[in-house]
């Protein structure tokens, strides 16, 4: 009989681990840390992708745009029946939110898996504890290319809750980014209403 046919696979249903008496290694659903920085970043990006593609995330976005009718660019005031409008995560970015949730688990030594983190991130959205802005697609691209600053007064959602409760799980570079975004207002941003005719008329 082939050795592979003799392998028995068992499971510890309490800890959600697979194991075999023939091998010294186990496979756990959850982890408590990462082997490398590359694995850490790959995990965060994977969670970010799953969240964006989830039905729940789409429902959150559609609720903002279709039900609440927050469907115009906060800068140009162009509406979604004229242009493509996107929801931009401002404080925190979606990557920053996932990073904070992962770091929290690591610091508190509580095990987690991809789906724990994704569920927690979606729940933060449904608790309205993320800061977001609706932007024209080209404005969204402009922001991510470092060509646009967004006044904090335009940001919706309870981003202050995130700052108070989750920012402690981020590193200095992340905190600097948050502080710089909090400091932007209509008086010191990189553009004026006169730059956008539609906005000037609003």
Where are these regions (language model features)?
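Short coil/turn linker and secondary-structure boundary residues
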Residues: 35, 92, 113, 117, ...
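Intrinsically disordered, low-complexity peptide-like regions
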Residues: 3, 8-10, 87, 138, ...
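Hydrophobic transmembrane helical bundles of multi-pass organellar membrane proteins
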Residues: 72, 89-90, 146
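Histidine-centered nuclease catalytic patch
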Residues: 78-131
């Amino acid at each position: 009989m082939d050795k592979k046919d003799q392998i028995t696979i068992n499971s510890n249903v309490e800890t959600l681990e697979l194991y075999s008496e023939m091998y010294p290694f186990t496979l756990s659903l959850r982890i408590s840390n990462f082997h490398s920085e590359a694995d850490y970043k790959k995990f965060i990006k994977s969670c970010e992708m799953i969240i964006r593609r989830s039905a729940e995330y789409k429902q959150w976005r559609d609720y903002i745009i279709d039900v609440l009718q927050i469907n115009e660019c906060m800068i140009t005031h162009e509406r979604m029946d004229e242009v493509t409008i996107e929801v931009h995560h401002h404080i925190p970015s979606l990557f920053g939110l996932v990073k904070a949730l992962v770091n929290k688990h690591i610091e508190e030594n509580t095990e987690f898996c991809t789906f724990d983190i994704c569920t927690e991130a979606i729940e933060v959205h449904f608790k309205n504890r993320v800061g977001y802005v609706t932007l024209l697609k080209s404005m969204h691209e402009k922001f991510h290319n470092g060509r646009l600053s967004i006044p904090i007064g335009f940001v919706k959602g309870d981003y202050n809750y995130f700052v108070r409760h989750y920012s402690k799980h981020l590193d200095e570079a992340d905190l600097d980014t948050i502080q710089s975004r909090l400091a932007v207002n209509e008086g010191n941003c990189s553009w004026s209403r006169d730059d956008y005719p539609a906005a000037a008329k609003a």
